[in-house]
Amino acid sequence: MTQARPYAGVEAADRLAGRRARLLCAGLELLGSTVDPAELTVRGVCQEAGVATRYFYESFPDKDEFVGAVFDWVIAQLAATTQAAVAAALPGERNRAGLAHIVHSIQRDPRLGRLVFGDQVANAAVVRKRQESEAFFAMLSGRHVGAILQRPTNARINAVSHFVVGGVTRTISAWLSGGIDLDSVELVDQLSAIVNGFGEPRLFRD
């Protein structure tokens, strides 16, 4: 098998990773704007990324896989930074720290809010990925609750975790669309008060 030679001192694998990263960034730029994913084209994505069209298919088999990869990439970064914010907070402030980080992240970069929480996106790939991300954050929430209560995650913890994550998601979505007239600090205060209200241990007893 012939090995790919370095080009301008950059190995082939690094060039591929660089092109993929540029395509993902272009995807966030386009999907986080007012463009409906149904209107995305491979040519448009590559033009935004500044790469030749042929390079799209070395990383993604089709447009739906690309949209899913952009969403996964965004969620992975948001989850990692949110977990870091929670870990750095005092025990009694961890719910607020996580919520504040999410709200302030989408306030700093509105593209994140439109992609992850926006009502205007009806693309099937995005809808599926949102469902997956809610399940993922519910799992993280359940682990957090289980650690606080010092007990294994059970069905009641799972039920509350899904309820809280779904409620927070819909509330942020309504806030972004202008349906909730609160500033970001007030929103975090309100969400924190609601989430903290689910800290009653009796809710989680079998």
Where do the PLM segments sit?
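C-terminal peripheral helix-coil segments that are non-catalytic and often amphipathic
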Residues: M1-A4, R143, T171-D206
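N-terminal intrinsically disordered/low-complexity leader segments
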Residues: M1-G18, L149-P152, L203-D206
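Short, amphipathic alpha-helix enriched in basic
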Residues: A17-R43
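Short, basic, alpha-helical segments at the C-terminal edge of helix-turn-helix-like DNA-binding modules
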Residues: V42, V70-A79
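Membrane-embedded alpha-helical bundles of multi-pass transporters/translocases
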Residues: T53, I75, G199-P201
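Hydrophobic alpha-helical connector segments
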Residues: Q83-R111
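Amphipathic alpha-helical packing segments from all-alpha helical-bundle domains
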Residues: A124-L149, N154-T169
